[in-house]
Amino acid sequence: MLFVAGSGSVGGVRSQRVDIAVIGAGPAGAATAIQAARSGANVVVFEKAAYGRDKVCGDGLTPRAVGALNELKIPLDDAHLIRGLRMIAGKQVRELDWPTTGKFPNHGAVWPRRRLDAALMDAAVEAGAEIVYETEATPVIYDNGRVTGVETNGHRFDAGLTVIAAGAQGAVARKLGADRVPDEPFGLAIRTYAATPRHTDVHLEACLSLKDENGTAIPGYGWMFPAGDGTVNIGVGALSTMKGFKKLNLNTLLESYRHLVQDDWDLGPNLERPRAWRLPMSTQRRHGDGWVAIGDAAGLVNPMNGEGIDYGLESGMLAADLFLDDPATAPVRYDQLVGERFDAFLRTGRRFSFLIGHPWILKPGLRLSVSTNAIANITLAVMGNLVDSTTPGAAGRVMKLADKSLGLVDPILRKTRAAA
C-alpha cells in the first residue's frame, strides 16, 4: 500500500512523507523514479549537481541497456545507434554485429551522458516525480539500523523506501556499511572527446591488447565510441589487479592509446580535458531495513568491460517494482533477485580480473579471446553484458564453467598477485 504524501514538523525539522526517496539522479536513480511514479508512487529524487550536468563516462550503451531504455519508453532519437563491436587483440581484428535474440535488441548506441541523463530525468518529472537539484541528501538511520528516509537542508523526507543511487561508493554508502569489499578488484578509467571523420561508424571499437608507454600489457582496454555528432569518445580503463597499478598514470596511458589510433581515426585535438573516474565492482551490502543500493552503488559493474548503465537501469526498475508490490519485503526480495540474476556472472568477472592480472596469462588469453569467430562471439556476449544466470547457449555454458573453474584457483590467484 502506498503512502499518502503529507508534511509536518518534528523537533523543528520540517518533514514530508513520500513513498520513495532516491539519492542520485543518474540512470539507475532515474529508472526507479520513472517506474515508480508512472504507477502512482510519490517519489522525490535528490541530485547534488545541477540539471544537465555532465557525467564522465564512455557513453556506450549495450543492447541490454537499449532494451532497458525501451522498457522505460525512452526514445533514442538523440543517440547514435551502434550495430556491433570491433575487437582488437594485437594484429587480430574481429568485427561482429550484436546478436539477434529474443531477449535484447540487436543494436546498442552511443549517447553522451549529459543528454542521456537529462532525457531520463525529464521522463521522471513527466511521470510525476519531484527532482531536487544541487542538494545533498543523507539517510536518516534509527538506532535499530532502519533507514526511514533522508534529511537535507533542515528538511526531512520520511520514505517507505530509500534508494541509494549515488554512483561509486562514497559517504552515503559508508554510512550504511555499503562500501566496496576491500580485497575485491575495482577499475579506473579516463576519457576525452576528439573530432573524427569516422564519427558515424556503426561499431564500437575495443583494443583488448592495451599497453602503456613502455610496452607493458595492461589488464583493461582502450575504446573508440563514435558519437555520430562529429566526435568520438576515446578512453582507456585498467583493473586494480595489475602489477604496479598504484603507479599507473592514466593520462599517459590515454596518450599512448591515442597515439596508437591517431591515424586510423584521423583524430583532431582533444575537445576537452581528459577526466577520470572509479569503477566499483563489489559492495559489502546492497540492502537493509528500509533501503536498497542500485547500479554502481551496489557494485553492479561488469569487471570485464567496466559497463554498468544497463545493470543500473534494470536494478532501478526492479527496486521500484518490488516496492510497488510489497514495500515491507522489497529490500530483501531485491537483494535476492539481484543476486540470482547477476552475482554468478559478476563474481566470475572479478575472479577473471585476478587471472589476467598475471602478465604471463594476460597475453595468451587476449589472443585466445578473438582467435576464432566462435570464441569471439562469446567474448562479444561478455563485453556486451549479454550474459547472466539465464543466458542459454555457448556463452552461458562457458560462463558457468568459468565460474566453477576460477572458483577453484581463485585463492591461489589472489595470493600470487603482483604488488599493486
Regions of interest found by a model, annotated:
Residues D321-A420:
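C-terminal helical "tail/cap" subdomain of flavin- and related membrane-associated enzymes
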Residues A28, Y51, Q169:
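Conserved Rossmann-like nucleotide-cofactor binding loop
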